[in-house]
Amino acid sequence: MQLEDYFEFLTPEDIRIKGTRVGIEHVLYEYIHCGQTPEAIAQKFRTLTMAQVYPTILYYLENPKTVGQYVGG
């Protein structure tokens, strides 16, 4: 997984899903804190595809400490 294929690292505090204005924290909030499925997240954020939602969740699952700090816990 090449992170640059999926995300735009604008600043250390601003990581967005490539090709969108959606920050990864919005998707991960729905996944981590609300228990939403990837399908429900894609429906909520209509500009995102499943091919964008899944890598965002995978990035979190593979890097829980780093991404957890980014999203605030």
Which residues make up each language-model segment?
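Long, charge-rich, low-complexity alpha-helical segments
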Residues: G23-G73
